[in-house]
Swiss-Prot record:
Its cofactor is Zn(2+). It comes from Streptomyces coelicolor (strain ATCC BAA-471 / A3(2) / M145). Zn(2+) binds at Q262, H265, D366, H425. GO terms for cellular component: cytoplasm; cytosol. Pathway: Amino-acid biosynthesis; L-histidine biosynthesis; L-histidine from 5-phospho-alpha-D-ribose 1-diphosphate: step 9/9. The keyword Zinc applies. Gene3D superfamilies: 1.20.5.1300, Nitrogenase molybdenum iron protein domain. Belongs to the histidinol dehydrogenase family. This is Histidinol dehydrogenase. GO terms for biological process: L-histidine biosynthetic process. It catalyses: L-histidinol + 2 NAD(+) + H2O = L-histidine + 2 NADH + 3 H(+).
Length: 441
């Protein structure tokens, strides 16, 4: 059901050579990019009409309008199962606790007497948040996108999720109910690349956004790449992935269930166990089969995900080697199920989020840990972070110098300008001192 990669016995290679030994899904955004280009251009030129046509083509329903009426959000909240509502409210409460602490304060550094640099943080003015709606329904992604944007102080928040033919062309009612709980009333029935293009270009119904965030499939990732440099994006999110670093103290039942929990997202989802215990590897592999048979989404998601080239049990000589492997892999979700798990977690350099010990499974983070589940995938955790309040903030430096403070450093500025053959830079300093630049101290 799941392959093995044995890295024991030989010294592990460095850098790219080690990454090449590790399992990864085929996820070529460049191929999808050429297919989304005409979709994005059509939305640019035809606006809502293109959105309506593409929704009929891809989602099988003809819309009368793209924006969801406010009464649909009210109706969805009124019809929400009380237990689901309570769970969403608790998820929102915990997410707010964590994300509120991420706010950044204005800070001033006095460089010299009379010369200061202040860094202030300003929220993006308008964001477009995307919540997928293909294989599953993700009200939790509404929470994970909206809460950090709100806590950052974003003034205008719009959200898009695919139209559902089953519900007459509106997004899934649970998505709408989550929006209502969070006070988001600008919601659009738009999915995939069309939603990203709508936010990027704007249409008759939807003003353009400064930034687009949220998870999605390869078409969403391709559209984000298409608009890189034109609008802000969070990341090109690919298929979800879990890596578990475990030793002989780990419970194979827990490990197997956690691997399966992420495999049920998508047939391209990655599930990777890294361990120095052959006995644990055997026990986990034995445990996978009965757990898979006892759940849903077996043939269309879980089995192909576990059997795919992106999933494996990786055997290593010891914990140090295991840490090197998980750092090279850079998992979206990394569980540490070892002795002294907190100390081991502290040694990890590359992961979207780390889940410490047997009582912090990835599922907790997906819904109600307080952390964010919009995380870098495909090894991007080596250089990128998950969605947070900072994602929606821009740092602006405010430079404030008096005449004396400028005079003190003027000679250095002119010298560097001349060294770079940019005499007008130096002239801008000289002009303030009647072409007589005082000696820098």
């Amino acid at each position: 059901m799941i392959s093995r990669i044995d890295l024991r016995g030989d010294a592990l290679p460095e850098g790219p050579a080690l990454r090449d030994l590790l399992p990864r899904a085929d996820f070529d955004v460049s191929v999808a990019l050429e297919k989304v280009r005409p979709i994005c251009e059509a939305v640019h030129h035809r606006g809502d009409a293109a959105l309506i046509d593409f929704t009929e083509q891809f989602d099988g329903v003809r819309l009368e309008r793209v924006r969801v009426p406010a009464e649909e959000l009210t109706r969805a909240l009124e019809g929400l199962d009380p237990e689901v509502r309570a769970a969403l409210e608790e998820s929102i409460r915990r997410a707010r606790l964590v994300h509120r602490e991420q706010r950044r304060a204005t800070h001033t550094t006095q460089v010299v007497p009379g010369g200061s640099v202040t860094e202030k943080w300003v929220p993006v003015e308008r964001v477009g948040l995307y919540v997928p709606g293909g294989r599953s329904v993700y009200p939790s992604s509404v929470v994970m996108n909206v809460v950090p944007a709100q806590e950052a102080g974003v003034g205008s928040i719009a959200l898009a999720s695919p139209a559902q033919a089953e519900f007459g062309g509106i997004p899934h009612p649970t998505i709408l109910a989550a929006c209502a709980l969070l006070g988001v009333d600008e919601v659009y029935a738009a999915g995939g690349a069309t939603a990203v293009a709508m936010f990027a270009y704007g249409t008759e119904s939807c003003p353009p956004a400064n930034m687009v965030t949220g998870p999605g499939n390869i078409w969403v990732a391709a559209a984000k790449r298409f608009f890189t440099g034109k609008i802000g994006i969070d990341a090109e999110a690919g298929p979800t992935e879990i890596a578990v670093l475990a030793d002989s103290t780990a419970d194979p039942v827990h490990v197997a269930s956690d691997l399966i929990s992420q495999a049920e997202h998508d047939p391209l989802a990655a599930a990777v166990l890294v361990t120095d215990s052959a006995e644990l590897a055997d026990a986990v592999e034995k445990e996978l089969q009965p757990q898979v048979e006892a759940t849903k989404h077996i043939e269309d998601r879980i089995r192909p995900a576990l059997a795919g080239r992106q999933s494996a049990i990786v055997l290593v000589d010891g914990l140090d080697e295991g840490l090197r492997v998980v750092d090279a892999y850079g998992a979206e979700h990394l569980e540490i199920q070892t002795a002294d798990a907190a100390a081991v977690a502290d040694r990890v350099k590359n992961a979207g989020a780390i889940f410490v010990g047997p009582w912090a499974p990835v599922s907790l983070g997906d819904y109600a840990a307080g952390s964010n589940h919009v995380l870098p995938t495909g090894g991007c955790a080596c250089h990128s972070s998950g969605l947070s309040v900072q994602s929606f903030l821009r740092g602006i430096h405010i430079v404030d110098y008096t005449r004396d403070a400028l005079a003190e450093v003027a000679r250095h500025v002119v010298t560097l300008a001349e060294a770079e053959d940019l005499p007008a830079h130096g002239a801008a300093i000289k002009a303030r001192f009647e072409w007589k630049v005082p000696e820098s101290k």
